[in-house]
Amino acid sequence: MTSFLPVNNTSSPQTRPMEEVATAATPRPHTNVSATEENRSRTMNSGTEDATPLNLHKVQEDSASRTKPSLGHNGTSHGESDADRDGSDHDSDAAGNAPPSKKKKGQRFYCTDFPPCNLSFTRSEHLARHIRKHTGERPFQCHCSRRFSRLDNLRQHAQTVHVNEEIPGDSLAATGTRFQRQIRTDRVRPQGRARAGTGGSQGTHSRGHSRNLSTSSIASTTSTYSQPPELRRRPPPLIMANDGSARTRLGLDTMADIPTTPPGQVRGIPGPAVAVGSPYTPSHRLFAAGGNGSPHLASARPAAAHMSGFWDGKTAARRLSVPTSANPFASQQPNNYPPSLVGSATPTTAAYPPGGVFASPVSSTHSFSREENAYSAADADLRRRTWHPSTHFALPRPATSGLSHYQTPDTVDAPVNASGATEQPPRLPGIESFDKVVLHQRPLTPPVRRPSPMQIDSHRKPSPSYALGGGFNYSQPANRPAPPISGPGHRRGHVSWDMSLHTNLTGLHIRDKPLPRDASHWSQQTIAELQNVSSRPSSSYQQQVQESRGITGHSAYEKMQGWYGGHTSGSQATRTSPEDSSSSEGVHTPSTASLEYHPAIVHNSGYIESHPPSMACDTSHSACPPLSQFSDGYQPHVKPDPRPDFYHNASVRDSGMGRLEALVAVATSENKNTAKLYG
């Protein structure tokens, strides 16, 4: 070291020999061997410099200052990131301890092999690295087969990517990272890594090397994993400082050994790291060895460590503190959880590792180290129970996980949701099923309508007067609900009724023509009904005509009878007509079906019911009471006054003509023409 001090203090010529020696150590051919030698020589130099620095800080500063001047110069002259990083590493080590101007001139190493590049470096090692960039050479290979042009990059890679993995002993990454780190942990820093360590202790530089250092590693999770021993020492205070003060204290006070998180991380690390003496190692051994039963512990643990940094314990502590209020639910939770979760939620000491991992990824993993440190197995169990329930109760997360039923605010809702989960699907399906019911049951509706028209007719006895008084009798709609007495038909009646109301209000043509909707929905029925109509067209149609006419001019009783007969066949006939004519018009079928159910309601006068049976009937019905009001739209309906005459005449004399006309009207769905024929 003393020899270095004079060199640092002396002018550049002496320093050159030093540098040249380093260069000799690493010839510029830049072979893989040379590269490794170069790095090793660098580390050796740094190691020699730093070996004493632990004890002699000034000496270290001096040695750093030796590099420092070059670094200062490097910072100004170096355009390359690598050189800058290296220089910055050393510069930061001795940040301005020595004036950079002294050694700049003598120590410069220039990149002359590649003409465009004229970068200068204070150390031959840096130049060698730089040249590897030009050549693209990557002599340092990781056991994962990735290659790097710089050893420090390889080490960083190993520290980050292979933190929790076993690195083969022959791997450069292993020698560069863990071996040296363990030595460093023991305060032995023979190699260049030690220099970075001293710099790290100074905290001046953030280089990759410094990251590797235990001191800087405190700030970096990656290094934390790689350096479990030191982390155990240092992290506790850091964790305390980082913890949300009282909140973490609640969970961590009993656990003065907050470093539990580092132990958790250490678990992920191979045995030697765990083996390093620490108050936590015993528990770790339990979980590492006894916990070996749960292979996922190690893997899961590292994952948790990555997620939470080395604050796993802290996170758990928070949850413990927060959930304490939820402890009363602890008993509920095990019951509430699915059996698998219950086991994990209330694990035995042996079950802790797996239980923690599965029950709540964050808290469970953290709880291990904590309880291991400060609690007996029984206490740990109790705390875990309260803690798990508390997390589920206090935190909304369980809701997503399906544990929401057990959350305090959700406990009431949870059962509702549970049943609701079953009920809700039925609700939606209920709506859909309702439509399905309408579709499927509509074929059944015509029979239901038959009695309903009777009732409506009975109610209609006064209705004609109402119709005379006002075109739209909504009192009849009130009567209309009676027809839907059939369960499904009832709601359908309402739906169809609403549809019919809209259609009636919007278009007068509805009376003139059966709504095309009827045809579409009743297409199937219509086919059968058409056949029925063809088989018995005369009787049904005449009855319908008589029915409509009877309503117009005859007593309510006759009208009811005519209705009944007419409606039964008429509805079929009507369907037939919509089917024939409105197959294209089928879109309107729903309303027509509703008309068939409650024609009176659909039509203001309430004749909609008569309307669906047959369009002719609708025509006549609309003509009957509402005729006065709807005479404009229903001129053909006005003729129903003579129709009452035809009622007898048509039934008696024109039965044959009525049959033909009814068939024609049904096929063409031309109600006006049919009405005119009878008129």
UniProtKB/Swiss-Prot annotation:
Expression induction: Expression is regulated by the AcuK and AcuM transcription factors.
Protein name: C2H2 finger domain transcription factor dvrA
Polar residues: bias regions: 1-15, 29-49, 401-410, 531-549, 569-591
GO biological process terms, semicolon-separated: regulation of transcription by RNA polymerase II; symbiont-mediated suppression of host inflammatory response
Disruption phenotype: Results in increased resistance to the chitin synthesis inhibitor nikkomycin Z and causes increased damage to pulmonary epithelial cells and vascular endothelial cells, as well as increased pulmonary epithelial cell cytokine gene expression.
Entry keyword set: Metal-binding, Nucleus, Repeat, Transcription, Transcription regulation, Virulence, Zinc, Zinc-finger
First-listed, main subcellular location of the protein, grouped into a coarse class: nucleus
A single cellular component GO annotation: nucleus
PANTHER family assigned: KRUEPPEL-LIKE TRANSCRIPTION FACTOR (PTHR23235), TRANSCRIPTION FACTOR, PUTATIVE (AFU_ORTHOLOGUE AFUA_3G09820)-RELATED (PTHR23235:SF127)
